[in-house]
Amino acid sequence: MEGVFNNKKFILVFVFMLGLCIGITTVHGQGTRVGFYSRTCPRAESIVRSTVRSHVNSDPTLAAKILRMHFHDCFVQGCDGSILISGPATEKTAFANLGLRGYEIIDDAKTQLEAACPGVVSCADILALAARDSVVLSGGLSWQVPTGRRDGRVSQASDVSNLPAPSDSVDVQKQKFAAKGLNTQDLVTLVGGHTIGTSECQFFSNRLFNFNGTAAADPAIDPSFVSNLQALCPQNTGAANRVALDTGSQFKFDTSYFSNLRNRRGVLQSDQALWNDPSTKSFVQRYLGLRGFLGLTFNVEFGKSMVKMSNIGVKTGTDGEIRKICSAFN
């Protein structure tokens, strides 16, 4: 019996030490955790949620804009709120970020949080939480957002060059995502966020009138859809017009975006390429449950990929700062 007891004791100690090691790895590897503000600012998440709800209820297009802002923040300098800084030559001024909107939501939430818990909640965390809440308000499933990020002290327009572009091939997209620790499934899943997105015509008009110098439209687009897009984006005059990336379901977070790719109705060249390339097409098919593929639940997988993305290059501990105002360094 003593031998059995000693064995059990050894196993318990081993399991405890293993758990301790895993916990240490998690803290040092990411530095964020669910419920980070549970003691220091218990109402942090509810304040952000109610703020986002108020703004999105007034303007449903803001949901996609906040989601896009979080993506752009994470892909440059990590998820540190650097996209929020105002001033000359900051990330906000880069061409790829000129169309970003919704900064007032983050500022509004920050003002309320500073009144409730001064100097506690970072702008980077507010943006991460707001992105989740925007998806939920659009009909998507919720997920737990690890918090504890600190705000970065650098914001340079010159660092924005690594953002995915609307004409990127699948190979280029995969390279850019892999550089951030994201795999091919994450790529397809996160781009699926375009289900509530829009784009200015200037980012895809090359597909409509003179694709690759052919004086014709991109043959990858369904001909009837070409006519629709040409009407929405008149040649030489409609560059700033906005078009939904998920036709017929612009404000609903669902899988119809993937159905549009299957039907050759992807607006951006980079989006339609996900259906045309075998390495990404298989994931699109799985989200649609096609041809016997093991199905994936888009809403569930989106939350998982968002957690991965939101931990890119986070600043924790004594790194960075907790800004008093999200648009300016302390």
Swiss-Prot record:
Biological process per Gene Ontology, one example term: response to oxidative stress
Single GO term (MF): metal ion binding
Positions of disulphide bridges: C41-C117, C74-C79, C123-C326, C201-C233
Localisation per UniProt entry: Secreted
GO terms for cellular component: extracellular region
Residues making up the signal peptide according to the UniProt record: 1-23
Protein's name in the database: Cationic peroxidase 2
Organism per entry: Arachis hypogaea (Peanut)
